[in-house]
A protein has these predicted regions:
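Positively charged n-region of N-terminal signal peptides that target proteins for export
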Residues: 1-7
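Residue-level hotspots at or immediately adjacent to binding/recognition sites across diverse folds
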Residues: 21-363
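Bacterial N-terminal signal peptides
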Residues: 7-17
């Protein structure tokens, strides 16, 4: 069983205890409705303009128009299992994916949802979705499963990201204006198992695989510029990839050490140019590539974080185990340095530390 499924299983057990059995819509096929929905395990958040849409266990979908201060649960969601990812491309058009290879769609900004695709016989989830606009997109998931659409999801057709006989899980799909093909298209990336990164220059029609020689799972990534990427790996590994030219055929790879061994789950670019990373066990890390420093907080609550959004300067919204919470790196530092504080926050900051690189090391 992969680490991802172990993490999801743990989250399910932890979240069920905070929800009442009477809130389940048994035999209706509709998602759990509960006043405690924002305290359940949340697996992903997506921000479009000033609206945040979040998804989680039991088909829970929530929206916030005040940057996470308050949450409204979706009125109708025809799905009762775990949702894993969500994306909105406009104020009205949103998609969510999850277990049973399910793809949900909303045309009213997340209030009501319908099923665009599912396969309940395929006992595994879609793990990530990326819509380049309201028509074109791709979903990826467990055992190499991937689909694409060019008509807003009216039709989802099979596409081959990987033909590896091992059928490695495809954990995250994303693109960036920072990296473009020779034709000027935004390059699309899929991070997966056994150190594989898949690249498409034609919006997911065809794919090339880059073997990072890292044998563990890759969870997420982000493009820094045309020649640099940051990729999240297992056991707290941050892969800093530098391509030698714009063809992306040759590269060097360093492994940054953030002072922890927790799995890392999400990475976002901050307004000041730094990068923030969320992780399990209360981990939040900020990378400053210009000054080559890492700043890490292990929150006293030790709750696992699945997603992070910048609210304002040094104010971040976290989602994950037990719902949502706000975070400040300065508060974490002050709590750690204040010997009279009863907080269990831990904080550290250091110059980049590069781990010894061992090809095909899975740890």
């Amino acid at each position: 069983m992969s680490i991802f499924f172990k993490i999801i299983s743990l989250f399910l057990l932890l979240s069920i205890s905070s929800l009442f059995a009477s809130d389940f819509n048994y035999d209706t096929g509709l998602a759990l409705k509960s006043n405690l929905a924002d305290k359940a395990t949340i697996t992903s958040m997506n921000k479009h303009n000033d609206k945040i849409v979040a998804v989680g266990v039991h088909g829970i979908i929530l929206t916030s128009n005040d940057m996470g201060v308050s949450w409204i649960q979706a009125e109708k969601v025809p799905f009762t299992n775990t949702l894993t990812d969500v994306q909105c491309v406009s104020e009205s058009q949103c998609w969510a994916v999850g277990h049973d290879l399910t793809i949900l769609h909303s045309v009213d900004g997340g209030k009501n949802w319908s099923i665009q695709y599912d396969d309940i016989d395929f006992d595994a989830p879609f793990l990530s979705i990326h819509m380049t606009d309201y028509l074109n997109g791709i979903v990826v998931g467990a055992f190499g499963k991937s689909l694409k659409t060019s008509d807003g999801g009216e039709n989802w057709i099979s596409t081959v990201v990987t033909d590896d006989a091992y059928e490695p899980h495809l954990n995250s799909v994303y693109s960036s204006e920072k990296m473009k093909s020779e034709d000027g298209n935004n390059l699309m990336f899929v991070a997966g198992e056994i150190g594989q990164v898949h690249i498409s220059s034609d919006q997911g029609v065809s794919w090339n695989m880059v073997d990072t020689e890292y044998f563990g799972s890759l969870w997420d990534g982000i493009s820094v510029d045309q020649k640099r990427k940051l990729i999240l790996g297992m056991a707290g590994k941050i892969l800093y990839v530098k391509f030698s030219d714009e063809t992306l055929n040759e590269f060097s790879l360093d492994t940054l050490f953030a002072g922890i061994k927790n799995s890392l789950t999400d990475i976002k670019k901050l307004n000041n140019g730094n990068y923030i990373i969320s992780g399990n066990g209360g981990v939040i890390t900020i990378l400053d590539l210009e000054n080559e420093t890492t700043e890490t907080c292990i929150r006293g609550d030790r709750l696992s974080n699945t997603s992070v959004i910048e609210v304002s300067n040094d104010k971040y919204l976290l989602s994950g185990e037990k719902g949502f919470r706000f975070h400040s790196m300065r508060d974490c530092q002050n709590n750690f340095e204040d010997k009279s504080s009863i907080s269990k926050d831990m904080w550290m900051k250091s110059e980049f530390q590069y781990e010894e690189w061992v090809p095909y090391d899975w740890q």
